């Protein structure tokens, strides 16, 4: 097969591993900087151009779309879908997962475990917003934040009110969530490929840090999932329509709750913690899907 990896940096671990896995399985691979692509949007022959030339017809594309380029990145993915390429994750599914509010509403609709959450822009009763999720301590998040940026733990109701007021001052959309104290600053990253959890790791925040992101100094280790945790991760991926994703869970007193579904999960942490060849599993998934006609759900209609 001819495969394109949409990535802004060919030296990144995840990009390199996907390229190595695809080449090892006998495929042709191009790495294309998503932002340097430009599109010819015509009704008879849509195309994507790069470095002054139209890109060839790819059997499959692997989008590695960073949060900061979601709008343009998903437009490029959608253009490839219109050209008939199979996308590991469809443009519409990536867009769903990047919108924190929309993704939580979709998970809620499917009855998937979530922390108690409030959403606001300019609430007329901040005290009620905080009380409605159980009161302090609460976690307050900027809707557009990534990698733990824009996430604040408020230990008291007064502190929570002050933080909400500060975010209101910059006209930000915010999420207010119950703090799952029993998780102990740890979460579980479940790596889902093709409707199955293929690897899982427990990420522990640095001492004194409630955020467990590896970018913030957290550590990772192999973890054994319960059947309920495994089913929750698979259901969350399905609710987003994502074939490949990282589902972040917290172990709460009332069962696993989903914190985030990541459409472009990194491979370095999960492969190091589990010693599993996740990149190879992704390429194998593409091979299996390409053997079936019409394997892209929306075929670019999204």
Curated annotation (Swiss-Prot):
E.C. number: 6.3.2.-
InterPro entries: ATP-grasp, ATP-grasp_RimK-type, ATP_grasp_subdomain_1, RimK, Rimk_N, Rp_bS6_RimK/Lys_biosynth_LsyX
Keywords, ordered alphabetically: ATP-binding, Ligase, Magnesium, Manganese, Metal-binding, Nucleotide-binding, Protein biosynthesis
Domain ATP-grasp: 104-287
GO-annotated molecular function: ATP binding; metal ion binding; ribosomal S6-glutamic acid ligase activity
Positions that bind Mn(2+) 1: 248, 260
Binding site for ATP: 141, 178-179, 187, 211-213
Annotated residues for binding of Mn(2+) 2: 260, 262
HAMAP family the record matches: RimK
Family to which the UniProt record says this protein belongs: Belongs to the RimK family.
NCBIfam families documented for this protein: PRK10446.1, rimK_fam
Name of the protein in question: Probable alpha-L-glutamate ligase 1
Organism of origin: Pseudoalteromonas atlantica (strain T6c / ATCC BAA-1087)
């Amino acid at each position: 097969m001819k495969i394109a990896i949409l990535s802004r940096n060919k030296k990144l671990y995840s990009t390199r591993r996907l390229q190595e896995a695809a080449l090892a399985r006998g495929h042709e691979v191009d790495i294309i900087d998503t932002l340097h692509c430009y599109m010819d949007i015509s009704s008879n022959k849509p195309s994507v151009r790069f470095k002054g030339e139209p890109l060839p017809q790819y059997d499959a594309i692997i989008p590695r779309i960073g949060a900061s380029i979601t709008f343009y990145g998903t437009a490029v993915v959608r253009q490839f879908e219109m050209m008939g390429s199979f996308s590991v994750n469809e443009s519409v599914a990536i867009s769903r997962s990047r919108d924190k509010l929309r993704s939580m509403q979709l998970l809620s609709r499917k009855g998937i475990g979530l922390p108690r959450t409030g959403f606001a822009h300019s609430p007329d009763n901040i005290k009620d917003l905080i009380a409605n999720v159980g009161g302090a301590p609460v976690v307050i998040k900027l809707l557009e934040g990534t990698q733990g940026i824009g996430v604040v733990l408020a230990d008291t109701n007064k502190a929570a009110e002050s933080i909400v007021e500060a975010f209101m001052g910059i006209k930000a959309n915010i999420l207010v969530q119950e703090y799952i104290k029993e998780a102990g600053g740890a979460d579980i990253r479940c790596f889902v490929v093709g409707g199955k959890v293929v690897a899982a790791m427990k990420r522990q925040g640095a001492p004194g840090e409630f955020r467990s992101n590896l970018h913030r100094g957290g550590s990772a280790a192999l973890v054994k999932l319960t059947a309920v945790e495994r089913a929750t991760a698979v259901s969350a991926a399905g609710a987003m329509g994502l074939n490949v994703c990282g589902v972040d869970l917290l172990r709460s007193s009332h069962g696993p709750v989903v914190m985030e579904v990541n459409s472009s999960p990194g491979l370095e942490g999960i492969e190091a913690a589990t010693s599993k060849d996740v990149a190879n599993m992704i390429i194998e998934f593409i091979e299996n899907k390409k053997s079936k006609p019409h394997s892209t759900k929306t075929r670019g209609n999204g």
